[in-house]
């Protein structure tokens, strides 16, 4: 039968005319990709998949409980006949509703909106409703059975955290107007959780690809004789199913062992051949054949493999020595049951009972069917397939041992997956649900059967016992544990006093600006922190940019310092994370394809002798084919048609081992790429005709030749349609113009870096591209904010990705309806004169400042910046800073109000209570230090004195900086407790010491606010807003900022905004002509006057507009720590650190430069010495040992020299003295040498 072929044909590539397509037009393809999926759409889709498929699948399929226990009840004669009771129950329906909360004033439940949860400190969670079927069976000694059944109607068990913006959220599919009406940001994408009033993000987590063999060399350690290991995690399905791991080890003794990691199997290294014998393959030759495939082959590789395998069979294993050469599989299974089984406490006690032995053996095989390679099947009829697959795994490990193939690249995204919030929460839910729901139900039934005779049980008894087990405490356990897994971030959480490993990685959502919010939602974390924290080569490799990153992981954005360097990454701008696809339909299509022979129809010898390629789907070996390349190409064309294969299916041909892999599992990174078509078939035919004509002596044989052409079908008109909104990415996929590629399949592609490279090799038949890329796609959103990033040192771009997330701006549009702690709202934000594609998706967070690059006095050394006072007065970088004060009424004896001094005691001395109205300072009131902002009193119980009825518990404002009361609220908490919530507003103008940054990562600190009259100016009267040290650029190589200033100068004079996205071409000649048209020099430098003397500067000054951002590091917040006194460490006497301990402020490098610029060197000495731990130390000049000085009685004494001592005073530090004491305690003496006395004549 002829295989099915694709039906759609595309027009000749020679007719495609896209010569007008520019690199700027190619940016529209990025816009199409972002508009299609959204910047965080994958996160919402992952959670929706959990709600619609994951939770129902987990509850219904994985928690079908079937346990039998010995009956303990013996009250009656019937009870004594009852030997055991079997408890069976399964959940028949699972439903998760939208968030609700109880309205205590009305006594009913109402919808819980996200902003209500934020203000009231609630968790945005939806009710979880379950329905179940219960079967209780009593087994009597006379063989009789009695069955009781009950159907549990749906009822609420607990609540589950709901993601903002998901299909279970009240804002789902709401219009922008409707979102405004409920106090939500109309442009906010969602993708986060609200737990106990705070906003949290579940990070994307790197994980290894399941159903894939990962082979690694093992470091030789003491007591470990392992050379190499292969790890294989088998998971049926592709998303939420349970997995099982096996570890295959090759030891220095030549032994090959297999360890099965499962909760039903004790960890034990079993000789590999025993697994084959247990499944019915007893002959050594047939076992070895499963690994080498062809015993008759005389190839060196085959011969060496057979030698290794034969040696491994004869290596003595002390544990399995009794069955090492045992051919009887029943005895092997029985021996294994005694060693590794967990389902019976003492298997050896059953040896005398043949029926019991047979039962144990069958039970053991049934467990092995479920936990050994379950993705290949979980029934007895799949055992042969499993053995063949296990032989293939050992075969690949032996090839690595012989250095035929390299070990697995641990850092390549070809063998990795990125799991979103849905998969992470599913892992936590499995463990928590088992502990907080399943265990109480089982215990509840056991208690019921202990108290009530089985024959007296009714359906009502069973339903009541089931419901009582899932009481309020159980509901709170499940809900509280899920919240804890999101909030705590701990590796271990406690559920019913039982530790459970938390596999959810989260971070608090700090809304500094919209870029910060989106970056937090696109963070990818590597959770292997054990190896990363070590100073090893492996730790260094984990942090490097891998060759598989471009297009999927941003190559520029990561932490710039600390342990998170290279461990916390960002998705590239067009990257997306796939959910699990429909495997069954594709599997059936592949098995029905005549080009594929099913695995059962192919022998191992045929695979080698006929050169067959293996075919896998989600890691399951389903068959073989004769032409792997043709099969992969044919199904890629099916995918391009969009009929048989889903567009997000991964089709990968591994030419090294000749395998075709189809992947539809969850967590695959994918990105769209434009397809490149060519006329290779016509070209080959023309070359063949030309060669034939030449053979025949035709002198005009060259006329038969045609040029080779390769091109993309994407045109400039399509780019315009995308920008106009009439063409989407889905349309491009449906038309076969682009397709989705994963890191695996990228290895089968030859991708042109840009449209320019494609055109350069348009007729080069030796470089046939499969796709063309957009250069900007290798960067993430934060990196694309930097203009001309490809001209800037990469480290500076990395700094900008972190600084851009700390800048002040508009953190959300719903700020009037929110009460946030430590949030800065910048008044004026401008669109940059040189914008980038990132500004299409995030609000700009800065100003176009006029910057002069020059030295002007001594106040802009290093990173110091001189700021124009008029720029500050005009509101440059000005904004509002918000704090919150939250007070709870802890009991019914407390109330809000203005304390009456006649009947209230413990009033705060010196406090001002006059501004209180009904317990709160009114909105718009200015409060200062010492003002009471929230009045609260508590009634003294049992107090008979009429003058002391109440005690004051008011909140006093304790900051030196005045504030304005911006909002006052009285929300109710989850248990109807009343809160007092106040939002305070502070003015945050630019101050000396505040930090700024350009978009090229060049950070500066305001060192001087210079009056307008002293600022330099150009011939046109233009004065700079900032004066920046030009020496900060050559060493940092921030060429992108220089280009931005030059282009911005031309744009400002001509009144246009241009695109400065990275990798766009820069025409220096055209830029110089634009400047010349405006009467400037070709390089943008201008003649300037000294504002203080009025004289010309000798050199031309480079001046122009540069986009600057203000970082949220405010000097006013740190002034509390600037003093000559404060708490100190008891041992060293040094000031404490941090606001919590009221400690001092760290004097950093940039602060040091500011003080140096101000000529305050003595201040530095004073703060780092006198105000720290400076002290006087007394030392004997004769022996160099410490001396003793009594301050109350001026007595100097040396323990060594006594009266001959010559003691001198030395300016020292307490930390130095403590160090010397520690060294002497370690028996290491330290002596000091003092300069001799110098006597001056009178």
Swiss-Prot record:
Keywords from the UniProt entry: DNA-directed RNA polymerase, Host cytoplasm, Late protein, Metal-binding, Nucleotidyltransferase, Transcription, Transferase, Viral transcription, Virion, Zinc, Zinc-finger
Enzyme class at the top of the EC tree: transferase
EC numbers on record: 2.7.7.6
Chain intervals annotated as zinc finger (C4-type): 1180-1201
GO annotations of cellular component type: DNA-directed RNA polymerase complex; host cell cytoplasm; virion component
Classification via Gene3D superfamilies: 2.40.50.150, 3.90.1100.10, DNA-directed RNA polymerase, subunit 2, domain 6, RNA polymerase alpha subunit dimerisation domain, RNA polymerase Rpb2, domain 2
Keyword check for Transcription: yes
UniProt-annotated location(s): Host cytoplasm; Virion
Pfam families from the UniProt entry: RNA_pol_Rpb2_1, RNA_pol_Rpb2_2, RNA_pol_Rpb2_3, RNA_pol_Rpb2_4, RNA_pol_Rpb2_6, RNA_pol_Rpb2_7
Induction cue: Expressed in the late phase of the viral replicative cycle.
Family annotation (InterPro entries): DNA-dir_RNA_pol_su2, DNA-dir_RNAP_su2_dom, DNA-dir_RNAP_su2_hyb_sf, RNA_pol_bsu_CS, RNA_pol_bsu_protrusion, RNA_pol_Rpb2_2, RNA_pol_Rpb2_2_sf, RNA_pol_Rpb2_3
Main subcellular location: host cell
Family affiliation: Belongs to the RNA polymerase beta chain family.
Subunit details: Part of the viral DNA-directed RNA polymerase that consists of 8 polII-like subunits (RPB1, RPB2, RPB3, RPB5, RPB6, RPB7, RPB9, RPB10), a capping enzyme and a termination factor.
Name of the protein in question: DNA-directed RNA polymerase RPB2 homolog
Source organism: African swine fever virus (strain Badajoz 1971 Vero-adapted)
